[in-house]
Amino acid sequence: MQVWRIAAHPAEPNTIFAGTSPSALFRSRDGGTNWEKLTVDLAETCPNVRFPRVTALEVDPTDHNIVWAGVEVDGVQRSLDGGDTWTRISGGLSDPDIHGMAISPGNPKTVLTSTPREVFTSTDTGESWQGLGVGQHFSMPYCRDILVKKDSPDVIFVATGESPFGVTGNLQRSKDRGQTWETMTLPAVPNTPMWAFASNQADPNFILACSHYGEIYSTDNGGDRWEKLPREFTEIRGMAWTPN
């Protein structure tokens, strides 16, 4: 079993969710010392990848009872009770190959989901989805994770790459909820597709982005300038920032 995604509760730092491959969801209420496996109807097999895996986990920043999970390749799951029960959500979501999810707390509150070639949005808690048509904007069309800036719901970041096995990647930013996009200038050429994001709840301008093969980039001004951390890791599946 591999851990592919983690998410920290916005108000209860000891509550952590984890998603794995093969696909399963776990929850800890004591900072990760003990874990319980959650009851979720997830696929055991799927096309294109050997085992389905949880590639997205989000806790709603304003209604903490709503938790989202995205599965590659098994669509979106939603919990309305903090992870106790789950429902598969699919209306209008044409691709079940989920790579990332994010929540924009603006008016209206918007849930965003990234798939290999598209970013979808929902303003009705996942009952229906609309595509943004990002393929016409991105120079590297393969999409992985997605992040919404905590204090600016119109600002969206997407981690992209050439292909699932590409040799490099980049970061895209939109300041108008996905209508237009710009490519971020990074201090080095990433060694694989860019893969995942993490952000600081207390300082929304501080954002981390990683490549699949262990490079981590940081910005302290909301994406205008990026630095590469000197330390590198092996494969990175996901990141999360906790206040303690």
Where are these regions (language model features)?
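Extracellular glycan-interacting surfaces
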Residues: M1-N244
